[in-house]
Amino acid sequence: MAEITAALVKELRDRTGAGMMDCKKALAENNGDIEASIDWLRTKGLAAAAKKAGRVAAEGLVGFATDGTRGALVEVNSETDFVGKNEQFQAFVRDVTQVALAEGITDIDALAAAPYPTGGTVAEQLTSNIATIGENQSLRRVALLTVNSGAVTGYVHNAAAPGMGKIGVLVALESSAGADVLEPLGKQLAMHVAAANPLALNGDDLDADLVARERAIAEEKAAQSGKPAEIVAKMVDGAIAKFRKENALLSQLFVMDGKTPVAEVVAAAGKDVGAAITLKGFVRFQLGEGIEKEESDFAAEVAAAAGV
């Protein structure tokens, strides 16, 4: 059996909000496997559903740039939050995002190899910045959204500077209406995405493995009710339908009023402007999402430096 360390218990508590003894028991029952322990706690009703696994721990900035019918989103990581406030780092994020937009880049390796505005490549400028700022930095990911007609709108939450912050969102609206008409709706929808964190545009687009995991948890919880099999099946189907509804953008309740599905908000906006509007897609980057940052033992570092 794997050793159940205090660090494992702490991580499980941080990710689930469950009590210490419950976390210890979950880890013991699942041989120290964090993900299996989360599912075990949820089947016992001791932990809330986690939309995405993994601690969010990396620093840096997410930047966006749009030009009407196109938008680019880029994440650049650093070791500390302090670098995210550095003007040179912010200028790099701004330039790299513009490069991604101008060149239509969707691949991080292609972005690294792209020409940088002041000369050389993006990767070479990044290397120069690392030497100047004195802290490791990396290009993490890039995304591009386009529409044939309409608008792609961007939004950042917790902005450190114009167009860059901790959470970045792009929303694509297809319509014959002008970009200036669509901009207010796009901004509100992007703010909704930042807050509600949908996992897909439609319920049917949700990741199959994620839905299967939710179904397994729902089946275990429903089985514990002791109800007849046909009732248990309906309970499971209801739980999955609720999961799809709450995690798909078009069926989520609009955060601005808390009662209207996003699909209805878009349809109503189309009637208001006299042109059909289709929400074609969205991209949401949360800084450090899915990256586990190694925690250092400061006392041990000092001791090592002193040769103790």
From Swiss-Prot:
Q: So which domain of life are we looking at?
A: Bacteria
Report the Pfam families cross-referenced here.
Answer: EF_TS (PF00889)
Checking InterPro entries in the record gives: EF-Ts_dimer_sf, Transl_elong_EFTs/EF1B, Transl_elong_EFTs/EF1B_dimer, Transl_elong_Ts_CS, UBA-like_sf
Q: Name one GO cellular component term.
A: cytoplasm
Please list where the region (Involved in Mg(2+) ion dislocation from EF-Tu) is annotated.
80-83
Give the main location: cytoplasm
GO terms, molecular function: translation elongation factor activity
Question: Keywords, A to Z?
Answer: Cytoplasm, Elongation factor, Protein biosynthesis
Q: Where in the cell is it found?
A: Cytoplasm
Q: Which SUPFAM superfamilies match?
A: Elongation factor Ts (EF-Ts), dimerisation domain, UBA-like
PANTHER family xref list: ELONGATION FACTOR TS, ELONGATION FACTOR TS, MITOCHONDRIAL
**Job description of the protein:** Associates with the EF-Tu.GDP complex and induces the exchange of GDP to GTP. It remains bound to the aminoacyl-tRNA.EF-Tu.GTP complex up to the GTP hydrolysis stage on the ribosome.
Query: Family assignment?
Result: Belongs to the EF-Ts family.
Would you tell me the protein name for this molecule?
A: Elongation factor Ts
What's the source species for this entry?
A: Sphingopyxis alaskensis (strain DSM 13593 / LMG 18877 / RB2256) (Sphingomonas alaskensis)
